[in-house]
Amino acid sequence: MADLEAAEEFTALYADNHRRVYAYAVARAGRPLADEVVAETFLVAWRSFAKMPRTAALPWLLGVARNVIRARNRDEERHRLVAGELRDWAAEPDIADGVAERSAVLTALAGLSENDRETLTLIAWDGLSPRAAARVVNCSTPAFLVRLHRARNRLARAVAAADELTIAKEPSR
């Protein structure tokens, strides 16, 4: 009976969190590896289900997904893939307002360190609170807030530098 209850509880956990874990995996490992990362994440969750924190399941699952991704990819290769994806996204034609700003931000983001990118995207793309994001990267909330502040400053400087470079390249009239 307990096994059936655990299976039902795990099924509910999967249904509640699968999309967010998948989105996290796609954003960090790309679509080709996302299904494998999600499968391994939930396999770890099933094996550790008795010890898993129920009140903070999503941050715990995202932390597991993070570890799965890091085990699969070395930092240099991962950086190359993310930078390539961001350049592709920035190069896509987009008729919406702010195309230049979007391109500048994505290019600047691609130039940041992996830790800065992850810190910024956990908040901006994944919609996590600083507290939940701190759990994902396995640090305290105050330490994460410092990381976030510094990453935002570095991103702002990179965008400003890109804007200055663009202005310098424009022909004078």
Where are these regions (language model features)?
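Short, charged helix-capping/linker segments at alpha-helix termini
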Residues: M1-A12, Y22-E40, F49-A56
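C-terminal edge and immediately downstream basic/flexible tail or linker adjoining helix-turn-helix-like DNA-binding
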Residues: M1-E5, E9, V136, R152-R173
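Σ70-family region 2.3-2.4 aromatic/basic alpha-helix that recognizes the −10 promoter
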Residues: H18, A39-S48, T55-R78, L148-R152
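Arg/Lys-rich amphipathic alpha helix in sigma70-family domain 2
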Residues: L62-G84, D97-G98, R157, A161-D163
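DNA-recognition helix of helix-turn-helix
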Residues: R66, R131, V137-A161
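Internal acidic/polar
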Residues: A71, H79-R102, S129, A168-S172
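Short amphipathic alpha-helical boundary/capping segments
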Residues: A104-S113
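A short pre-motif secondary-structure segment
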Residues: T119-L120
